[in-house]
Amino acid sequence: MIDTVEYAATTPDQPQPFAELGLREDEYQRVREILGRRPTDTELAMYSVMWSEHCSYKSSKVHLRYFGETTTEEMRTGMLAGIGENAGVVDIGDGWAVTFKVESHNHPSYVEPYQGAATGVGGIVRDIMAMGARPVAVMDQLRFGAADALDTRRVLDGVVRGIGGYGNSLGLPNIGGETVFDSCYDGNPLVNALCVGVLRQEDLHLAFASGAGNKIILFGACTGLDGIGGVSVLASDTFDAEGARKKLPSVQVGDPFMEKVLIECCLELYAGGLVIGIQDLGGAGLSCATSELASAGDVGMAIQLDTVPRRAKDMTPAEVFCSESQERMCAVVAPENVDAFLAVCRKWEVLATVIGEVTDGDRLRITWHGETVVDVPPRTVAHEGPVYQRPVSRPESQEALNADSSKGLPRPVSGDELRATLLALLGSPHLCSRAFITEQYDRYVRGNTVLAEHADAGVLRIDESTGRGIALSTDASGRYTRLDPYAGAQLALAEAYRNVAVTGATPVAVTNCLNFGSPEDPGVMWQFAQAVRGLADGCAALKIPVTGGNVSFYNQTGAVAILPTPVVGVLGVLDNVARRIHTSLGTEPGEILMLLGDTYDEFDGSVWAQVMAGHLGGLPPMVDLAREKLLAEVLSSASRDELVSAAHDLSEGGLAQAIVESALAGETGCRIALPEDADPFVMLFSESAGRVLVAVPRPEESRFRSMCEARGLPAMRIGVVDQGSDSIEVRGQFTVSLAELRMTFEAVLPRFFG
């Protein structure tokens, strides 16, 4: 028997499994108050998924408002769409716009790594499609458990194959990201996928419905049982030792070839002016798409749910309405354009069905074979869900953690000890080559990738006639954020900003994905609140806006949470990609190596402390956002005037790691001369922020120095590139061959996962 609105009104006391669906008692009672009766089974399913943590942001919303409060009108200049849309959109000049966003698919990627990661890519790509853009590239931020943990191989193998399999099939280059191993992610991997798309500004589309009588068309794949309760429920729960594998049926199944056709179909529909509003079907499926479209447009909607094409027999209305089957879109189309819309879909062999229409008023009415199974105000579903001011409390352990400095750890002193330290860090899972992973992705498909592997940021050509392009980088540091959430978020922002700047691009906008433990833990909420404020204040200092993002809570097993991991993505613009700066040394004979920025004795939270002593404590490096802004301006000017031939950001592993990576990328040796009054260990391995290694063509050294001095940016000569050498020499300390460095650097991941 179908539970209709009429039947629900006459059976107020019928027991309902609201708790099993994730609703609290008070939330369930609020639904009853809104409706003036008990909800039908379909309504209950809809409210449960739409009021879940993943869909409603009910624990984070009060803190996320700070992004809006700190965004000035000056920062909004050039932002065409921001927080609240499927993805942020920014003006990059010459009539072009870029849309980009990062989202999590963490929990599904643990339950079923291949499909979890693959559909994570598919979902973020559809968000970009829904803005009217052509997706042009993807990136990923991955966090796995310890490299030697038994389950890490299963998860990593599936996740990497899923990302590569879906992205490669779509013909989208993977232009960068990060892979981090830490035992805190055992059982709780992070899979954060970013997609970037390009559009002409006049082609921008938004997610709203308007115009009574306009038709609602569902197009794409058929609706099945896969993903019932999927991401919206999984991402709102923690894992226990036994429960993870039981959740397998809730993970969606992706078809990248269907999505590839869907991309081309959407672009032709946009070009024909056939779309009024559009929404992709992701978490919560059709229940989300219809309620959000109606709510955003302040209209009603009538949907005949039984007309939805299904690939499983005997599906209930609730299952059809809340299915998270992939590769589906929902469009608002004028009646006179329906035939043309359907004709385009037939051309691309995309299934399309008129399932309803926009109505006057404020009711979302869903019928099943003529009987009403949903009759609700859409705003109460999509935008007026519960909002919680969760208890926030600085953990009692925080003071002791910050007092536990790394200064007492034994440090290398002799040249042999420094050499051994370099090789130990380089040969650890933390700093080793990621080529074993990235070589499974296509980085250059479509022919517009200018920088990818070995680069601090991915660079894409947008306009072939002018050379206009973009740079993208994503960064995060859970270790720094654990020590100080406010500073940790700013350090992630600073590094992503710096990574974009070292290509010569001007940073213009930010996206984020905030990965934390349970919001029911006051200590986790303190970390979250501090990180949000740090990121928002940092963006205000740099004068670049947050255009959108994602929150992923409940990343913990039992009472043990992951390190707080705010992932920050920064978008930059290059007026001509021909002037981009790469990381490889040796493109000019006799390049001068210079270190920009100040180096301090800062090792708390460093990779050195982790690898050599398993230590995490103290305070993270200082962050100076004014210095970061100055660095970006200098690098942009140096790129434009061709004063710098290579540049590499300093972060984990410090100067030593940056030198090795740039030397290996250029397959050339170099000679390093550290200041005589400096501690070689500090100079080589400190992780002080705001620093960049640059290679300057010998004839330009004087001009470059003068530019840095005029702007007040410290610039120290630390060596030269030696194209006739096959080793790195640190004068008075040690020499190590490129062959030994490469073998150490590249052997680690194949040893664990090959």
From Swiss-Prot:
One term of GO molecular function: phosphoribosylformylglycinamidine synthase activity
The EC number on file is: 6.3.5.3
Gene Ontology cellular component annotations, sorted alphabetically: cytoplasm
Kindly list the positions annotated as binding Mg(2+) 2. Answer: 127, 280
Q: Report residues binding Mg(2+) 1.
A: 103, 550
Output the NCBIfam families linked to this UniProt entry.
FGAM_synth_II (TIGR01736), PRK01213.1 (NF002290)
**Under what name is this protein listed?**
Phosphoribosylformylglycinamidine synthase subunit PurL
What organism does the UniProt record list as the source?
Mycobacterium leprae (strain TN)
Q: Where is this region: Disordered?
A: 386-412
Listed binding positions for substrate are: 104-107, 126, 252, 324-326, 552
